[in-house]
Amino acid sequence: MAASCDLVYVANDAEIGYPVVRSMSPPDNQFFPWLMGMRNAMEMMLTGESISGEEAVSYGFANKCFDKESLSDEVIKIAEKVAKVPSDIQAINKRAVHRQMEAMGMRNGIRAGTEMQALAMHSKSTQEHLKELASGLKEALTKRDKEFGDYRTKEKD
């Protein structure tokens, strides 16, 4: 969901990832190359590994990261600044950025991502994973992550 947001703020130690790419291709991964470049997007898509909040900022996936304890306060400060700008100006400012993204081909990228998602939904691997999910969500997700030792199967400190 964060991939499609205008602004993203995370905790330094956040764990951001998309493990579902190990078993099926999700629709919102089409934003990854636009946000963090081809190589970082490719690594996340091919491994399903997570990145920290600090890495998310350095990759361009998030705007800023803060200590977990101060995250809410810092985001509220930013929201208060955003709220001081008249809404009609904010609408134009957002439109200006979105128009530039469209000029750079993002609309075609979204369309291509949607086509890839349609193909992926009919792949053998996705169909098998959907059957596993229908049989038991926790078991299917644990099976997906077990081989990698992360997400659901990661050892807790």
Which role fits each region the language model picked out?
Residues 1-90:
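Crotonase-fold acyl-CoA enzyme core
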Residues 52-53, 84-157:
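C-terminal alpha-helix plus adjacent terminal tail
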